[in-house]
């Protein structure tokens, strides 16, 4: 308790800091303390004692009364001030306390570090657990390794070894050079005279020497010999060494080696013979270290030559030297690896025979040769174990020095340093630096260097990142500054704070000189400077400077201190910088609308003039994403390495060009003076690689700069459409539809070819034209007939005389579908190998340019596979080729083969009386509309507008009988029998329209304006992350292309994908342009009933759900307007109410439930509507659509407003076609097949909750902040601080009387705990884990399916899914027991399928809870 008159402190940090007025703290009362706002725990607050009139408007004496004002950090991460008005705390304009703000910032940083520490500890524990798992797995796998059987020793090898050993122990049983003879020379005859003379002289000299030797001389000689041989003084050791000579040592060693060979060798015969020949030849120990160099063949060659050496050493030496030469010639038929091994063995044999003979002749022993060979092998082995170099790293892990370890590396560095340390030939210049022009840029992601230039602070764009404001540190002071502009380069311009304007400035260099550049930067708050010579590569520089942390954004200056570039990065070998120009300081001014229209008119005129001569196809430029815009994650590591290697190759190429330029560009008449000096051409460079090698290198890392020379060659020859990028696709003045204007007329009735068939190349010009903007150009038709030239203002694109259906082409676009490995993983045969690649003349120019080298490589693999009849390498090779094609915007070759095999669909032709419009336009159905006929499926309270010819059934009484279910045991739990697959007749269609009716809503916007305003405020506040969303291009939209294309396209195409393959994107763009120009076609929706598992009672009552789908062109127009918002909603499921895109796996369910529990409210509500999307009031649905539209970017919001109004009008007033051919009009509810059905239902659900909250509690915004909810369509689970009395009855009445919506009694469950409530088909248990709410429905879908499973593996996989869903159910639950029983049955039939028999408990918990790394409970 707080004593009266004592200052109040909320926590120990608050007492330690003691910010503000102590008098204000003394005024705190217990009532004021209990009503305090929710500040951050254990954080300081500042107390102020302020005059009341300065805060609350008042007059009289109360003006000068003082009130307590508290300022601090709130739990939602904001900074606010609150004043006590006598009864409660009221939020006021924040009062700035610099010390408090700094403290809160440090506390926030400390909390973040603690959180990082906690995560690191969790990761450490996870890694430790993984290590234990791996250790257990290692032990288990070791047990599975088969133990080798003991080798049986055969008696014959024991006998052979004994005989060879006996022969080896015979004295003189080896080659003696004195007794060798030769077949070429009679050595005895030649040396007879010399030998007799030498013998006589030798005997005479020995006799004279022995006559003069005394006893003392003999003792001294023995003593010196013993000392020289290091023989110990011990008498018994001298005796042993005396009797054991070299001869006896080798024989003992050979004897032991022979025994070991018999016992352990895998080829004892060959090894024993080698041992014997080594003794016989006299080479002995020198043979052993050469054996690993031999193959079986060369080993027998060596044995043969050693036997030959015993009889004739000169002949053996000659044959040994000739053996490698003959082997090189006669063994060339072998493959490379075997060929090299054989030649290596022959060379080793030659070295042994020749070297052994030299050693025996000079020293009488081969010990020296043995030592040399053994030393070479040891050095080779040591270099392998030690490594090539040592790396010395600093505390941050960055390499600061490398030390070579191999001898060749050390020698290379020595000669390099020796060459560099020659006589000084020049004088280094001084450079100008301005340390006062540098500062430090601090962001939450890290620090970098900036410099002052003009009125801006310049740094690297990747230092700023996505931050709008950054901290500028200069001379110990910190300033907040706003990021002004970031061009396409990796440069950012920051507005200089007013207090920093008098500082020094760096000017740009007008005459760049790259002979000596200076890099200045701050590293750990220390100024570092380095100079180097730079090389220019397009818009970038490279120089040999090692980058350290914090150098990004530093200025790169010339020797006069003028800025040349902005330092970017370091790939480990060279530093890099982007060149900065004066034009980079200011955004490029976008052309006005009039200028754009003029350019468009001129471009169209040029197209029309050249259409007859140069037919072209559609060109679509892929959006270019720079390296700065890419996020560095685990999945991007390979791309980043490729980009770095591409840059290093380009740097190396330019440097070599600069060095070789003086030698390669010698002109006639020039002298050789100065030819040896290095002259660098900094602006130009000659490619040293061939075009094929260059393209192969670019395929590993394409970017705009290095690929510009290829873009000009493929303009007009490459088709496709731009990928959607929600961050980089848009710009303020160009959103993809800028080419459409009010005064520009497009004729889209002409057929547009989106295929990749080889077009006629455009004529070459002397000056290459710049890459045009993505556009669609009409392909001219047959112009062979003479036509009168029309005036320029009347010229139009030629129209077809007769509408024709365009069949799918074999080279059609795949529309952005990435290749999937499963499509390639099948048994390939010779036909597949022959037809996977088209003939060379069928390849497009884009294929040749982008995929040329890969296609050549695949053709080689195909030829080899057909010859060897081994097709195992084809799937991976074709997959890699298709993957590269997909990344380049081309169609995969497997898809082309499929298109050929499938061929065009044989469907009825389009009606001839529709003219150029036929079935492409959105209102084409109107021309087919016939007068109404008999009313069969449309209820009487809906209008019957007419009849359309369609062939679709209105009866469905099919109940599939799956024979695979006969394998499953008979169930003992029959609760599932109340469910079944839907069947219907005409009455079900009539009944399905009841979803739109329950009660009539009132004009709630007029009756309850304050509550509606509160609901709007809450909706804008909840979905504020949708602010500034964009309209995307129609060709960048994503949608399920396997869906029906609606009427009348469904008469000619089964799916939208077939329609796209036949006609491409031209009809889509034409219809969007038509709507944009003011036309308002009426769209036709197609209605069908949903096949699903529902209660048998509903089936008997024909209560089946209806689904409506619109024309795919209309759906994609809606995707243009709302796809960006939908994508953002799916990304914010953790913090927002909408759960579309949410996954309950990996702890997702528990995390969401914990989020509601953490609010601390006492009440939890489960809410379920009936006929939810059908009874949504049209006024409310239109209002939600308007709220969504208000989040769109301001410029685009006004530009496309009329398109959005037309789109919403067709949602609210739907012309619907039934399978019976009847056409009616629906004006109620949210259609279940529109593009944003679940997202719109979420927003309507949330808006209704906010209205309901204000209806019972009043529009209390502070109380609303304690409210939280999660919604998925009509599912709702919420937590609220208060619930009124008789809540269920009152809320049901409110929705019926005000909105006309139906909430059945019993569908509103209010509890003081979240346990037992359900959301998205799961009930929350005590551990906040999911339990299926209706397991009997799941069992019905297993035993009474509406679709037959294809095979037994699918049935087993379905059972595994049910086991996963039942993970947290009671062990004795009938559904869980039955699933386990079924798994045991199906697992016996699938022993070799690769599927697990069942999921273990550990696997189930890993899937639901996320495992150690993603564990949420």
From Swiss-Prot:
**Family matches, as SUPFAM superfamilies:** DNA/RNA polymerases, Trypsin-like serine proteases
State the Pfam families in the record.
Answer: Astro_1A, Astro_p19, Astro_VPg, Astrovir_pp_1, RdRP_1, Trypsin_2
Spans of biased composition, class Basic and acidic residues?
784-796
The modified positions for O-(5'-phospho-RNA)-tyrosine read 694
Q: Where is this region: Disordered?
A: 753-813
E.C. code: 3.4.21.-, 2.7.7.48
Gene Ontology CC = host cell membrane; membrane
Write out the GO MF terms: ATP binding; RNA binding; RNA-directed RNA polymerase activity; serine-type endopeptidase activity; serine-type exopeptidase activity
Active-site annotation: 462 (charge relay system), 490 (charge relay system), 552 (charge relay system)
Looking at the record, the residues that make up the RdRp catalytic domain are 1162-1288
- What this protein is called in its record is Non-structural polyprotein 1AB
Q: Which residues form a coiled coil?
A: 105-143, 588-615
């Amino acid at each position: 308790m707080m004593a009266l008159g004592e200052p109040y402190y909320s926590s120990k940090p608050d007492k330690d800091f003691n910010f503000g007025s102590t008098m204000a703290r003394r005024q705190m009362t217990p009532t004021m303390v209990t009503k305090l706002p929710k500040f951050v725990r254990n954080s300081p607050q500042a107390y102020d004692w302020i005059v009341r009139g300065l805060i609350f408007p008042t007059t009289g004496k109360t003006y000068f009364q003082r009130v307590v004002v508290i300022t601090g950090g709130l739990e939602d991460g904001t900074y606010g001030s609150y004043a006590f008005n006598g009864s409660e705390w009221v939020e006021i304009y924040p009062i700035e306390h610099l010390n408090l703000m700094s403290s809160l910032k440090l506390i926030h940083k400390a909390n973040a570090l603690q959180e990082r520490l906690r995560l690191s500890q969790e990761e450490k524990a996870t890694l430790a657990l993984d290590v234990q798992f791996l250790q257990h797995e290692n032990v288990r796998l070791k047990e599975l390794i088969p133990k080798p059987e003991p080798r049986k020793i055969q008696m014959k090898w024991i006998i052979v070894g004994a005989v060879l050993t006996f022969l080896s122990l015979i004295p003189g049983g080896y080659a003696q050079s004195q007794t060798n003879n030769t077949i070429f020379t009679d050595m005895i005859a030649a040396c007879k005279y010399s030998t007799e003379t030498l013998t006589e002289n030798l005997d005479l000299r020995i006799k004279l020497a022995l006559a003069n030797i005394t006893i003392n001389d003999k003792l001294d000689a023995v003593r010196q010999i013993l000392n020289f041989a290091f023989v110990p003084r011990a008498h018994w050791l001298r005796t042993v060494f005396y009797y054991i000579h070299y001869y006896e040592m080798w024989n003992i060693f050979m004897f032991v080696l022979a025994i070991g060979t018999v016992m352990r060798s895998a080829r004892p015969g060959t090894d024993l013979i080698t041992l014997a020949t080594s003794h016989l030849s006299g080479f002995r120990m020198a043979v052993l270290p050469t054996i690993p160099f031999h193959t079986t063949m060369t080993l027998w060659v060596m044995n043969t030559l050693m036997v030959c050496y015993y009889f004739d050493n000169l002949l053996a030496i000659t044959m040994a030297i000739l053996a490698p030469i003959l082997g090189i010639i006669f063994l060339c038929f072998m493959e490379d690896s075997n060929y090299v091994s054989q030649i290596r063995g022959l060379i080793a044999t030659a070295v042994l025979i020749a070297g052994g003979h030299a050693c025996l002749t000079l020293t009488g022993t081969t010990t020296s040769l043995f030592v040399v060979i053994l030393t070479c092998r040891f050095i080779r082995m040591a270099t392998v174990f030690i490594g090539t170099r040592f790396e010395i790293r600093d505390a941050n892990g960055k390499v600061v020095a490398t030390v070579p370890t191999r001898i060749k590396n050390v020698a290379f560095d020595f000669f390099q340093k020796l060459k560099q340390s020659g006589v000084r030939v020049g004088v280094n210049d001084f450079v100008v630096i301005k340390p006062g022009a540098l500062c430090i840029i601090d962001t939450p992601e890290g620090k970098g260097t900036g410099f002052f230039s003009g009125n801006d602070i310049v740094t690297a764009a990747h230092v700023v990142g996505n931050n709008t404001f950054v901290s500028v540190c200069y001379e110990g002071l910190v300033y907040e500054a706003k990021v002004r502009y970031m061009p396409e380069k990796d440069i950012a311009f920051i507005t200089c704070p007013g207090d920093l304007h008098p500082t020094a400035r760096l000017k740009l260099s007008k005459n760049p000189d790259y002979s000596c550049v200076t890099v200045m930067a701050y590293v750990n708050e220390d100024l570092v400077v380095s100079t180097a010579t730079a090389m220019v590569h397009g818009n970038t520089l490279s120089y040999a400077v090692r980058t350290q942390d914090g150098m990004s954004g530093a200025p790169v200056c010339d020797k006069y201190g003028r800025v040349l570039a902005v330092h970017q990065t370091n790939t480990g070998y060279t530093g890099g910088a982007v060149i900065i120009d004066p034009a980079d300081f200011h955004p490029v001014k976008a052309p006005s609308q009039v200028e754009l229209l003029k350019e468009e008119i001129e471009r169209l005129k040029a197209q029309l003039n050249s259409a007859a001569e140069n037919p072209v196809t559609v060109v679509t430029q892929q959006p270019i994403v720079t390296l700065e815009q890419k996020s560095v994650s685990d999945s991007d590591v390979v791309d980043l390495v490729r980009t770095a290697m591409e840059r290093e190759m380009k740097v190396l190429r330019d440097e070599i060009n600069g060095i070789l330029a003086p030698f390669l560009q010698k002109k006639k008449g020039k002298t050789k003076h100065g030819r040896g000096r290095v002259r660098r051409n900094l602006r130009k460079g000659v490619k040293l690689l061939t075009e094929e090698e260059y393209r192969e290198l670019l395929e590993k890392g394409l970017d705009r700069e290095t690929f510009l020379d290829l873009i000009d060659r493929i303009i007009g020859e490459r088709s496709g459409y731009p990928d959607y990028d929600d961050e980089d696709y848009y710009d303020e003045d160009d959103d993809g539809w800028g080419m459409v204007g009010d005064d520009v007329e497009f004729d889209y009735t002409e057929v547009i070819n989106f295929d990749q068939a080889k077009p006629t190349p455009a004529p070459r010009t002397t000056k290459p034209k710049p890459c045009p903007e993505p556009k669609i150009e009409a392909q001219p038709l047959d112009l062979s007939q003479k036509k009168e030239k029309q005036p320029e203002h009347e010229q139009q694109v030629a129209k077809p005389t007769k509408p024709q259906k365009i069949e799918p082409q074999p080279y059609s676009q795949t529309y952005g579908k990435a290749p999937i490995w499963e499509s390639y993983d099948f048994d390939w045969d010779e036909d597949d190998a022959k037809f996977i690649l088209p003939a060379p003349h069928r390849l497009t120019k884009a294929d040749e340019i982008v995929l040329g080298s890969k296609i050549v490589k695949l053709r080689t693999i195909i030829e080899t596979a057909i010859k060897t009849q081994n097709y195992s390498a084809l799937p991976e090779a074709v997959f890699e080729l298709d993957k590269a094609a997909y990344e380049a915007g081309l169609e995969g070759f497997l898809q082309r083969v499929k298109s050929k095999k499938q061929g065009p669909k044989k469907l009825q032709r389009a009606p001839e009386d529709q003219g150029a419009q036929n079935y492409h336009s959105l209102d084409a159905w109107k021309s087919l509309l016939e007068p109404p006929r008999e009313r069969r499926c449309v209820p009487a309270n809906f209008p019957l507008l007419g009849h359309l010819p369609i062939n679709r059934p209105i009866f469905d009484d099919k109940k599939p009988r799956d024979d695979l279910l006969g394998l499953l045991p008979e169930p003992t739990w029959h609760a599932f029998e109340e469910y079944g697959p839907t069947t219907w007749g005409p009455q079900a269609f009539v009944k399905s329209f009841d979803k739109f009716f329950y009660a009539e809503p009132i004009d709630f916007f007029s009756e309850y304006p304050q509550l509606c305003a509160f609901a709007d405020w809450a909706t804008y506040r909840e979905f504020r992350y949708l602010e500034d969303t964009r309209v995307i291009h129609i060709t960048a939209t994503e949608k399920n292309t396997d869906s029906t294309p609606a009427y009348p396209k469904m008469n000619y195409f089964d799916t939208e994908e077939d329609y796209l393959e036949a006609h491409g994107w031209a009809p889509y763009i034409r219809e969007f342009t038509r709507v944009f120009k003011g036309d308002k076609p009426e769209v036709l929706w197609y209605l069908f009933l949903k096949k699903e598992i529902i209660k048998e009672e509903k089936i008997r009552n024909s209560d089946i759900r209806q689904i409506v789908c619109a024309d795919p062109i209309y759906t994609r127009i809606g995707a243009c307007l709302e796809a960006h918002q939908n994508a953002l909603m799916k990304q914010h499921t953790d913090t927002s109410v909408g759960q579309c895109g949410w996954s309950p796996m990996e702890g997702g369910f528990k995390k969401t439930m914990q989020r509601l529990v953490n609010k601390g409210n006492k009440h939890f509500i489960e809410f379920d509507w009936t006929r939810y999307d059908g009874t949504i009031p049209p006024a409310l649905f239109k209002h939600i659509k308007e709220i969504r539209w208000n989040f769109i970017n301001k410029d685009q919001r006004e530009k496309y407003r009329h398109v959005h109004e037309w789109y919403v009008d067709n949602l609210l007033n739907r012309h619907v076609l039934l399978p019976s051919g009847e056409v009616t009009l629906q004006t109620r509810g949210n259609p279940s097949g529109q593009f944003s059905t679940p997202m719109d239902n979420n927003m309507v659900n949330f808006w209704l909750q906010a209205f309901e909250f204000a209806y019972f509690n009043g529009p209390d915004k502070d109380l609303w902040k304690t409210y939280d909810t999660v919604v998925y369509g009509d599912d709702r689970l919420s937590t609220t601080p208060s619930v009124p009395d008789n809540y269920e009855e009152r809320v049901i009445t409110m929705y019926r009387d005000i909105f006309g919506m139906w909430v059945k009694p019993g569908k509103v469950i209010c509890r003081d705990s979240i346990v037992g409530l359900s959301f998205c088909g799961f009930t929350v248990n005590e551990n906040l884990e999911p339990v299926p709410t209706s397991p009997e429905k799941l069992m019905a879908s297993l035993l009474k399916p509406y679709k037959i499973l294809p095979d037994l593996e699918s049935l087993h996989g379905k059972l595994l899914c049910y086991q996963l869903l039942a993970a947290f159910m009671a062990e004795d639950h009938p559904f869980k027991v039955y699933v386990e029983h079924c798994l045991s049955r199906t697992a016996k039939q699938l022993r070799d399928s690769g599927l697990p028999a069942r999921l273990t408990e550990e696997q189930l918990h890993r899937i639901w809870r996320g495992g150690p790394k993603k564990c949420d409970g």
